[in-house]
């Protein structure tokens, strides 16, 4: 978690994904208006019900968090990404 835990307006998370890591077998949603996925290094594929979007280092994708989605890191490279979630879905001290 990059953003402060008590920040309710936005949540910023830096994630190191091992090669082949994924978000699980099923699509999921997040209770937020906007989700941004930015790839720092490696590659990741964002999956939606009707499409797949490959992303490489330097690429960003913005989408509604309530849209069913999933992701998978490149099998050889893995990925390092920044997730930005607006508003924050977790609030705590």
Describe the role of every protein-language-model region:
Residues 15, 38, 46, 61, ...:
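Preference for bulky hydrophobic residues occupying beta-strand positions
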Residues 4-7, 53, 60:
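Short polar/acidic secondary-structure junctions
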